[in-house]
Regions:
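Solvent-exposed soluble domains appended to multi-pass membrane proteins
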Residues: 1, 6-224
């Protein structure tokens, strides 16, 4: 059934652009690396994850290090396990003062049908982090609700949005239905977050981007 958008992402899209990322379907950590460090994955080996190679032992120039020199406190937040992509150790080498993962969030009981912690929990964590310091903050937040895999069987009891007509492939209909319902809930989260930040008693700049397209059997022509 049709469902109006919450206008959460619509508000953000008033100032939008295009971002070329180095991965499709997976590889969030490599998009993270490029956006945090400013370095292209073209300088690394084919299929390499800097989080698992050079950053397993070395530090790296990054936005957090630059901002720390300007008096900022630097934080990373992620509603997933800290060891995923070795973030537990990598983020300190990228210059983050703190890293809050799901292990340190008070209530992670609200999860998707496939077990990912829903993104609305991030609003409180972001505000809590802003409140915890006197200096300006740089907060890099990674959401996980829309993560795959995407079920090929119906897993939502009463979906807000239903999907049909995916090239006569019923299983793909269920995958897209699951995905778009997660995006719908994430849109509501964005609206809640932007509302909270609009009322925050400090100047705030919010930048959002997508790390990669979903794993939906997309072909090259679908990416053009």
């Amino acid at each position: 059934r049709d469902q109006p958008r919450s206008r959460g992402l619509g508000d953000v899209y008033k100032r939008q652009g295009y971002l070329r990322v180095p991965v499709v379907g997976a590889g969030t950590a490599n998009t993270e690396f490029e956006t945090i460090s400013g370095m292209s994955l073209r300088y690394f080996g084919a299929g390499e994850y800097p989080y698992k190679s050079v950053l397993s032992e070395e530090t790296c120039e990054s936005a957090p290090y630059v901002l720390k020199n300007l008096g900022y406190a630097t934080h990373a937040i992620h509603n997933n396990e800290a060891n995923f992509y070795s973030r537990r150790s990598v983020f300190s080498r990228l210059g983050f003062d703190t890293f809050t993962s799901e292990e340190y969030m008070p209530d992670i009981s609200d999860v998707t049908a496939t077990g990912w912690v829903k993104d609305h929990i991030l609003t409180k964590e972001i505000i809590k982090t802003l409140d915890a310091t006197d200096e300006p903050d740089y907060i890099y937040t990674i959401s996980v609700q829309g993560h795959g895999d995407y079920p090929t069987e119906p897993v939502l009891d009463d979906p807000e949005i239903t999907v049909t007509g995916a090239e006569d492939r019923e299983k793909n209909n269920y995958s897209w239905e699951y995905y778009v319902n997660q995006i719908h809930e994430m849109d509501i989260f964005v609206k809640e977050l932007t509302t909270k930040l609009a009322d925050y008693p400090e100047p705030v700049v919010l930048v959002m981007y997508g790390d990669h397209l979903p794993t939906m059997g997309l072909k090259v022509e679908d990416l053009e």
